[in-house]
Amino acid sequence: MGDAAVHATRAAALVEGSVVMKLASLKNGSRDGKLVVVSRDLKKAVAVPQIATTMQFALDHWSSVAPALAEVYQGLNHGTVQDEFVFSEQDCESPLPRAYQWADGSAYVNHVELVRRARNSEMPPSFWTDPLMYQGGSDDFIGPRDQIEVVSTEYGIDFEGEVAVI
């Protein structure tokens, strides 16, 4: 996996002014995970419950929490933050384990053709004039290193990776 893909899966990067912060949601047994600030090199993290308990809370209150998150991020990178711990992507949830919604547009005709062929389905004639877009269920996102659970291979399940822009 290239550096860009690793960075995208390990932490969500959010911009506050000219400061790029790396934030992640750690698994903690709750439905939304626990927000942590992650160091630039992705080696250390620190929980910030005094600022925001979840990524969703941080996004919903961005204008009021971003300055404090940026300060923690700078301190973490300069070694001046207490209670830091080793960051491990295996401990991560999806950045937003339960997003309000997500939409997917199938822009790659080759991919659509391959999937249709695998299911012995014809390409719909309308595909060439009407963009294929759908809204997906976002109640069960998984973390970047979680196992993909499949009840039975008899369903002919196909899966793909998606990129989230937060």
Predicted regions and their residues:
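Short, Lys/Arg-enriched N-terminal segments with co-localized hydrophobic residues
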Residues: 6-20
